[in-house]
Swiss-Prot record:
Transport in keyword set: no
CDD domains reported for this sequence: AdoMet_MTases
Molecular function GO terms recorded: RNA binding; rRNA (adenine-N6,N6-)-dimethyltransferase activity
GO cellular component: cytoplasm
Family assignment from sequence similarity: Belongs to the class I-like SAM-binding methyltransferase superfamily. rRNA adenine N(6)-methyltransferase family. RsmA subfamily.
Enzyme Commission (EC) number: 2.1.1.-
Keywords of this entry: Cytoplasm, Methyltransferase, RNA-binding, rRNA processing, S-adenosyl-L-methionine, Transferase
Binding residues for S-adenosyl-L-methionine: 19, 21, 46, 67, 92, 107
Functional note: Specifically dimethylates two adjacent adenosines in the loop of a conserved hairpin near the 3'-end of 16S rRNA in the 30S particle. May play a critical role in biogenesis of 30S subunits.
Protein name: Probable ribosomal RNA small subunit methyltransferase A
Amino acid sequence: MVRSILKKYNIKGGTFDQHFLIDAGYLDRIVAAAELSPQDTVLEIGAGIGNLTERLARRAKKVIAVELDPALVSVLHDRFDAAENIEIIAGDALKVDFPEFDKVVSNLPYSISSEITFKLLRHKFKLGVLMYQYEFAVRMVSPPGCKDYSRLTIDTCYFADASIVMKVPKGAFQPAPEVDSAVIKLIPRPAPFEVRDETFFLQFVAAVFSQRRKKLRNAILNTSSLLKIPDIKEIVSQLPEDFMNKRAEDLTPEELASVANMIFDLKSRNF
């Protein structure tokens, strides 16, 4: 079915980071993972030729399909303009104002994985089922101390529960990407730890993971300009030694939040 659509419209892929999922088994498993109901409005980013769109529309109340490539937008209109429950939005998903939606299910363009994920996580929705490059997906769910534990892990953990649903081999796509992929399930929820100031916490995580191999004391001192703290030495001198002598990659999200909160409180006192 998918190959026939690609042939009919002379779609080659490769433009706009396009890799079309052509394996029907994986398409069906993605839809099943979304646990759709007839009441759900589903957002799909990078709808492509509509092979996932079509399956989503069978189970959901409405599908909002976002696509950047004008050629593919034309394909989507040709295939689905008669469908009452599919809305097609032509545009860049990073710039489009998303309508309200309940769930997001997408084979994401890999080049915008980080940006689009955190744009999504700032929206209210029930569940996400999203395709990423495999290594990116692993970084989203890695425990502290692992080589893949990163800023991405912390940021994801702050906004949502994340788990790998399945690994998808590169041969399931046309054209095949260079690496395997994985499907992540995201369930947004309130932060599992206290953060005094969300913006500062996320800046702090970005700063210390930019020097992840250094002890936290040095990582903080070396990134004071990023954190906009002129009196950083005075503040660091008041932070617990057991944290300062560890690397950022060895601290749990809760511990990093604790350090960020202490710095924020001390900074607010204007030493």
